[in-house]
């Protein structure tokens, strides 16, 4: 409330980089959604490139109308 689940190809991020990413996303949500810091949760799910089609099929394509930033690619 809000919860953000970032899915991306695998990256070698340090714990410090993950913390910074979460802090930046949290800051944006606080600013734009008037959320409290304690209400925000952020997940980072790394998906192998050969498994991305499943993400597209289950999460991106069916929700295209709800996406506030659409991808510049299709599958």
UniProtKB/Swiss-Prot annotation:
InterPro entries documented for this protein: 4-OT-like_dom, Tautomerase/MIF_sf, Tautomerase_PptA
Keywords noted in UniProt: Cytoplasm, Isomerase
Disulfide-bonded cysteines: none
Keyword Cytoplasm carried by entry: yes
Domain of life the protein comes from: Bacteria
Subcellular location: Cytoplasm
Documented EC number(s): 5.3.2.-
GO cellular component assignments: cytoplasm
Record keyword Isomerase present: yes
Annotated active site: 2 (proton acceptor)
GO MF assignments: intramolecular oxidoreductase activity, interconverting keto- and enol-groups
HAMAP family in alphabetical order: Tautomerase_PptA
Quaternary structure (record): Homodimer.
Family statement: Belongs to the 4-oxalocrotonate tautomerase family. PptA subfamily.
Family matches, as NCBIfam families: PRK01271.1 (NF002324)
Protein name, per record: Tautomerase PptA
Organism whose genome encodes this protein: Klebsiella pneumoniae (strain 342)
Gene name tied to this protein: pptA
């Amino acid at each position: 409330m809000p919860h953000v689940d970032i899915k991306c190809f695998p990256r070698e991020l340090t714990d410090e980089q993950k913390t910074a990413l979460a802090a930046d996303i949290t800051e944006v949500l606080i600013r734009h959604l008037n959320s409290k810091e304690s209400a925000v949760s952020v997940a980072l799910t790394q998906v192998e490139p050969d498994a991305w089609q499943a993400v597209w099929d289950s999460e991106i394509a069916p929700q295209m109308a709800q996406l506030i930033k659409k991808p510049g690619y299709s599958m």
